[in-house]
Amino acid sequence: TVGFFGGSITQGSLATAPEKCYAYRVFSWWRENFPNTEINYVNGGIGGTSSLYGVSRAVTDILMYQPDFITIDFSVNDKADEFFQETYEGLIRKMLTWPSRPALLLLNNVCYDTGINAQKYHNEVGRWYHLPSISIKDTVYKKMKAGELKREEITPDGLHPNDFGHALVAAEIIKYLDSVKAHMWEDEEEATLPAAITENAYERAKRLTIREICPVLDGFRADPQEKTSHLDFFKNGWIGRKP
């Protein structure tokens, strides 16, 4: 099982079809390169969410599918500060200690208008746990700043890639996967999980829904409506009676 976890870019915002987003393109690489293996695709991207919410929903939205490989990207929704470094580390530790022991790849997308992302803080966590990372800021964005690409070719709003932009992001990930595949038979020692580099207050965070708790309600009601589409994310919660 190949999983992707992040915000709106991972979700596939502004791609013309779900199959055009970077995540599905990378999933297609797995299927093409390992044709004799049944490979499942899980996309846990939710627009506008950070690793703070991500660490609380990781079990139900991706880990319960027992993934073998996860690409993680909260680099444009997390602020570049120590708070989100801590929530991000909690997410990484939760994934690394999951029974399926997934391999993790850190992805850092970027705001194309400003060059801002959280990769400095995220990559400090990645280096501590010896995890590989892909920087769109240091590749696609760098080419754009050098005049090799135009912003309008990549993204209409300065943040979310169009189909071509998603293809560029996928190409950077696939380039790395090709290099790993070329050396896949080499032995590697399994790393021991080190102590956390932050206070790590969020590793055990859990999202509570109407399935787990029955709070006293004042002005709200439970929402038992079933999910109606793949973009219908926020279910089993509560709805306000007034706007």
Per-region residue spans from a language model:
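Cell-envelope and extracellular/periplasmic
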Residues: 8-9, 13, 34, 43-59, ...
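Accessory beta->alpha helical hairpin/"wing" motif in late/C-terminal subdomains of nucleic-acid enzymes
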Residues: 161-162
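Extracellular serine-dependent O-acyl
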Residues: 103-108, 116-154, 167-181, 186
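Alpha-helical scaffolding within the catalytic cores
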Residues: 1, 24-27, 51-64, 85-94, ...
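Sec-exported extracytoplasmic/periplasmic mature domains
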Residues: 31-32, 59, 63, 93-101, ...
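Conserved catalytic region of serine esterases and O-acyltransferases that act on ester linkages
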Residues: 167-243
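Serine-esterase "nucleophile elbow" of acetyl-processing enzymes
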Residues: 1-44, 57-66, 234-237, 243
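Active-site segments of SGNH/GDSL-like serine hydrolases
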Residues: 73-77, 86-124
